[in-house]
Design a protein with these regions (language model features):
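Charged helix-capping and loop-helix junction motifs
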Residues: 33-40, 72-77
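Active-site gating loop/helix substructures
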Residues: 1-27
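Short acidic/glycine-rich loop or secondary-structure boundary segments that cap or lie
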Residues: 28-31, 65-70, 101-105
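A short helix->loop->beta-strand "cap" motif at the edges of active sites that frequently abuts
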Residues: 46-56, 148
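C-terminal functional extensions of proteins
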Residues: 71-185
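Active-site rim loops that border cofactor/substrate pockets in soluble metabolic enzymes
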Residues: 1-3, 60-79
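Structural beta-sheet core signal
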Residues: 58-60, 95
Length: 185
């Protein structure tokens, strides 16, 4: 049977002032929820409200997911969301970048377009090697061209480099909420 959205969840989305997509796996956590009939429409209703429109934030992943988002950069993540119903609905993309991970970001791989190419991309790559999602100045500008305001911050947990640091994320959320509030005035 086809997936159906829980009516109370759709109501809450329509009434929301702040909608957050992520952090999470792009193709197995975030986008599948957008494919459920009614979810994107509820986000659109909240976002397009005349009085007190909702602000929609996307929290970009810190690192690629083996077999899912290999080689995708920050622009690719936001573009994937726009191609899955979120065009014109994303206000801010929270993107990670810091001096320690930037050198690692240069070791990313081109996105797989055909699964048969997977062997080529993984050849010589050590299992468990971390590749942070690339976020160069040029890519951040491309995110802006999609109509999404990028907010670039150091968000990594120094103890667990594939996790967001919850305190850094909380501070960034406070900034986003302040930006959304001032935009609505």
């Amino acid at each position: 049977a086809d997936a159906q959205a829980y009516p109370a969840a759709l109501r809450v989305i329509r009434e929301a002032n702040f909608i957050v997509l992520g952090p999470g796996s792009l193709f197995t956590s975030i986008i599948p929820n957008l494919l459920v009939p009614g979810v994107v429409e509820a986000i659109r209703e909240a976002h397009d409200r005349e009085n007190d429109p909702a602000c929609t934030l996307f929290v970009c992943s810190l690192a690629d997911m083996q077999g899912e988002t290999w080689g995708m950069n920050c622009y690719d993540y936001v573009d994937a969301l726009t191609r899955h119903g979120m065009r014109g609905l994303l206000d801010i993309a929270l993107i990670h970048r810091n001096a320690k991970t930037s050198p690692m970001a240069s070791g990313v791989f081109p996105a797989l377009t055909d699964y048969s190419d997977a062997r080529w991309y993984t050849k010589g790559r050590r299992t468990g090697k971390l590749a942070h999602v690339e976020a160069t100045d040029e890519l951040v500008e491309q995110v802006k061209e999609l109509g999404v305001q990028p907010m670039v911050r150091d968000l990594v947990d120094p103890e667990r480099p594939t996790w967001h640091d919850r305190e850094k994320l909380a501070r960034a959320f406070q900034e986003v909420l302040a930006a959304c509030h001032s935009r609505q005035r």
